[in-house]
């Protein structure tokens, strides 16, 4: 039976302590809050207005076929963008200094079909603690179709996983909305990690959000535009969103240079938690302002994993501090200059996992 490991820092590194001191000093010296600002709130409102406007136009005004497909593609992109920029920061409590608005931002994902509650358990508690640890980190548990790390069992089909993976990635949101949320809900755990005890309100919110989504995204559109038109539009939206979400999240951890640490015999991880995060995480395209704006700073994954409660709008600034500290402590800082470089590395990693 797999149990959750402990981070022991057997080398006695002071890296994390020193890094926290330097980053905290940056905010104190510059008199800046660690949460979001007007630019983030403007982006959140912009994305939601665009999404709602497109939904109304597609469902109630029934534009032509190709126009509708184009708008569904845009809605798929906006679904991912809202997840990256609004829900993600809100879920980590970094969207605002107000707990109320952080809750609103975090649970906005419910309107997009996913459960904010299940996401919080899967992402904040499991993934951010046990990153890239096989058998615990749910983000690399895509068995048996994909072999993401060397300790997972290999099948013949994995020889081709670097080819068919892109189709599987398009299914992420569909599986998330219709299957994985329910698996976690009824099993009351994420992998081997138990869910936090759900309150009566949590149960009510889970089912209300699911029913509301099914009505708004399935029942009402079918009534308005007929089944076939709805099916095409729904698949275009969800598959495009799934592809974007999958690629951005996988480029952060499953590339050639990231590690997949295995606990020692006593079930300890030899490094302190912060060093573990850097060894298992990679950045990409950090100089590309458009990508950074669209993906909510998730191309700065090292910064995010080290300081998840700091809003992504601050990642470019604190990345300089983190790089410098990594250099001083001789810790490799993994970064791909362009997004295409990270995509190639991810593809080569999957190809290697299918052959070794």
Residue ranges and their predicted role:
Residues 2-25, 171-186:
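Short, charged cytosolic
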Residues 35-83, 110-111, 160-174, 197-248:
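Alpha-helical bilayer-embedded segments of polytopic membrane proteins, i.e.
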